[in-house]
Swiss-Prot record:
<dbReference type="InterPro" id="IPR017853">
    <property type="entry name" value="Glycoside_hydrolase_SF"/>
</dbReference>
<comment type="similarity">
    <text>Belongs to the glycosyl hydrolase 13 family.</text>
</comment>
<dbReference type="GO" id="GO:0004558">
    <property type="term" value="F:alpha-1,4-glucosidase activity"/>
</dbReference>
<feature type="glycosylation site" description="N-linked (GlcNAc...) asparagine">
    <location>
        <position position="537"/>
    </location>
</feature>
<feature type="site" description="Transition state stabilizer">
    <location>
        <position position="377"/>
    </location>
</feature>
<keyword id="KW-0326">Glycosidase</keyword>
<dbReference type="Pfam" id="PF00128">
    <property type="entry name" value="Alpha-amylase"/>
</dbReference>
<dbReference type="InterPro" id="IPR013780">
    <property type="entry name" value="Glyco_hydro_b"/>
</dbReference>
<dbReference type="GO" id="GO:0005975">
    <property type="term" value="P:carbohydrate metabolic process"/>
</dbReference>
<feature type="signal peptide">
    <location>
        <begin position="1"/>
        <end position="30"/>
    </location>
</feature>
<feature type="glycosylation site" description="N-linked (GlcNAc...) asparagine">
    <location>
        <position position="140"/>
    </location>
</feature>
<protein>
    <recommendedName>
        <fullName>Maltase 2</fullName>
        <ecNumber>3.2.1.20</ecNumber>
    </recommendedName>
</protein>
<keyword id="KW-0325">Glycoprotein</keyword>
<keyword id="KW-0378">Hydrolase</keyword>
<dbReference type="InterPro" id="IPR006047">
    <property type="entry name" value="Glyco_hydro_13_cat_dom"/>
</dbReference>
<feature type="active site" description="Proton donor">
    <location>
        <position position="310"/>
    </location>
</feature>
<dbReference type="InterPro" id="IPR045857">
    <property type="entry name" value="O16G_dom_2"/>
</dbReference>
Length: 594
């Protein structure tokens, strides 16, 4: 869990220069500025990936929990919006301690969500609508209810070393203690004593989520088998969860103190140099990439099978996931979380430009950028940046070069529901934190049910009680209302996806500048096509903008997309030298000769 931070302009420039200097062999400005000249762009390279959190998306049977039939019923909505790929948060069999991230059977569907027949129907329906399905794959750990763990705890020879087991140590009073000072991401020791086995097992997350031992070739083979099982079911790839936690130092040394906190049970108490981002992780990424490439080659009738990887890690680590120094390729899409972790509602225009340039400049040649604006683990866009910024942030997301990732509900500007009571709180870290502190860490606010309409439970479910409370603002903030409105966040989002079909946004050159501390702009240019300019005001005040220097000469602009509160309208002609942007406004324009 990376903490958001702000950098001074001087620090940013020094870091950017450092990145360029230390990575001299990498293409610097070419990946940032040059047009993509290839005739072929693979299906995923310009896709909008729409993350569905199934438990909160749509309930089809009235039990208060979203399910696969609910997802199937809403696939036409995704197709109508223009979505061509969706990744589903975990749907595998699970005790639901961490709501699917504690898997008890990788080859079965969670009973609450449906059956394997439902999943097969989902894939077939999605395929008929031109939508590809990506599954969330959780390899770092299983549930403690998984058959593998039960057999490992019993020292079954075939599963004895499937997990990370270790003896404890005795303190001066002869009391048994964990092997070292490693902490769980969810708070507390990362070690849990198992009475039957007579050893501790490692759990980097909840104690019900024991870590698998990827140094055991049998574990790797078992996970390969899981991937092949779902590939044969027709999925187009996987999003790999918590990737950088896969390996730990075998000698189990104490981790050095970070100095960030005096609480020895806090995850921030130590520097995680022995439990995260070990070199072996990269080898596993490359192994899985080869598996996917081999599968694609053997099944030429299907599209490229891809890997998306989740890791809150240093930039160099993420770039190596793309391709290492020896040219070995890994993840097609190492998730770029900079819009989540490195900018906020307090950021100025230079912060945004810096974080965009940093990824594009550092990315190895021949790879595809990606931009994740939100997910199920972090506050929503409307909460992080403010409701007035929703359209501008979606304009940013959908006109940058490469892949865009949208969390369900962001197209409406859904907001976190921060008033969930302690009694209704279900998120594991929040429950561990306790009644006084749960709101500081709970992920429940961003996971509330999708707001389809102003009907009971926002049209999500007919149940008397839903698994999480519905945000009360659904009465005014819902899809049905936004479809009927003259202007709405949803209509802006849909128009942006339509705009993305233009060759200039698929293959155009890219350049970006901060025009001031409060406004930045970028343009996409391609020979024989109109240039598009995206302008964003990140401040809470109206700004007068002169684009003349940025576009090299005075020109007229034609508005392509404007936000819901904008005074401008699509098709309107305006001057490049005297453009007024209201607070948090974004605008996309086409250039005309003066």
């Amino acid at each position: 869990m990376a903490a958001a931070h702000q950098l001074t302009r001087t620090t940013q420039l020094l870091l950017l220069c450092s990145l360029l200097w230390t990575q001299a062999p990498r293409p610097v400005m070419s990946s940032l500025l040059s047009a993509q000249t290839e005739d072929f762009i693979d299906w995923w390279q310009h896709a909008v990936f729409y993350q569905i959190y199934p438990r909160s998306f749509k309930d089809s049977n009235g039990d208060g929990i979203g399910d696969l039939q609910g997802v199937i019923s809403k696939l036409p909505y995704l197709a109508e919006t223009g979505i061509t790929a969706t990744w589903l948060s975990p749907i595998f069999q699970s005790p639901m301690v961490d709501f699917g991230y504690d898997v008890s059977d990788y080859k079965s569907i969670q009973t609450e969500y449906g059956t394997m027949a439902d999943f097969e129907q989902l894939v077939n329906t999605a395929t008929s609508l031109g939508i590809k399905i990506i599954l969330d794959f959780v390899p770092n750990h299983t549930s403690d209810k998984h058959e593998w763990f039960i057999k490992s705890a019993a020292r079954d020879p075939l599963y004895d070393n499937f997990y990370v087991w270790a003896d404890g140590k005795l303190d001066n009073q002869g009391v048994r203690q964990p092997p070292n000072n490693w902490q769980s991401v969810f708070y507390g020791s990362a070690w849990q004593w198992h009475e039957q086995r007579g050893q501790y097992y490692l759990h980097q997350f909840a104690k019900e989520q024991p870590d698998l031992n990827f140094r055991n070739p049998a574990v790797v083979r078992a996970m390969d088998d899981v991937l092949l099982f779902w590939l044969n079911k027709g999925v187009a790839g996987f999003r790999i969860d918590a990737l950088n936690h896969l390996f730990e130092d075998e000698t189990l040394p104490d981790e050095p103190l970070s100095g960030k906190t005096t609480d020895p049970l806090s995850y921030d108490y130590t520097k995680h140099i022995y439990t995260k981002d070990l070199p072996e992780v990269l080898s596993m990424v490359q192994h899985w990439r080869q598996l996917l490439d081999d599968y694609t080659a053997k099944h030429s009738e299907g599209a490229t099978r891809i890997m998306m990887t989740e890791a809150y890690a240093d930039l160099q680590v993420l770039m190596d996931y793309y391709e290492d120094a020896g040219g070995v390729r890994g993840s097609q899409l190492p998730f770029n979380f900079h819009f989540i972790t490195d900018v906020s509602g307090d950021s100025d225009a230079r912060d945004f430009v810096y974080n965009i340039e940093k990824w594009l400049i550092y990315m190895p040649r021949g790879h595809t950028a990606n931009w994740v604006m939100g997910n199920h683990d972090k506050p929503r866009v409307a909460t992080r940046f403010g409701p007035a910024s929703v359209d501008a942030m979606n304009m940013l997301l959908l006109t940058l070069p490469g892949v865009a990732v949208t969390y369900n509900g962001e197209e409406l500007g859904m907001q976190d529901y921060d008033e969930i009571s302690w009694e209704d709180t279900v998120d594991p870290p929040a429950r561990i934190a306790g009644k006084l502190d749960y709101k500081k860490v709970s992920r429940d606010p961003e996971r509330t049910p999708f707001q389809w309409s102003n009907a009971t439970n926002a049209g999500f479910s007919t149940a008397a009680k839903t698994w999480l409370p519905v945000n009360p603002n659904y009465l005014v903030l819902n899809l049905e209302a936004q479809k009927q409105a003259v202007k709405s966040h949803y209509k802006v989002y849909k128009s942006l996806i339509e705009l993305r079909k233009l060759p200039v946004l698929r293959r155009g050159r890219f350049s970006i500048e901060p025009l001031s501390r409060t406004v930045f702009a970028f343009k996409r240019t391609l020979k024989d096509y109109d240039t598009l300019v995206t302008i964003i005001n990140v401040s809470a005040k109206e700004q007068l903008v002169n684009l003349t220097d940025f576009i090299n000469r005075p020109q007229k602009l034609v508005v392509e997309v404007a936000g819901v509160d904008s005074v401008y309208a699509p098709g309107q002609t305006i001057s490049s030298s005297a453009l007024t942007l209201s607070a948090h406004e974004g605008l996309i324009c086409k250039l005309l000769d003066a």
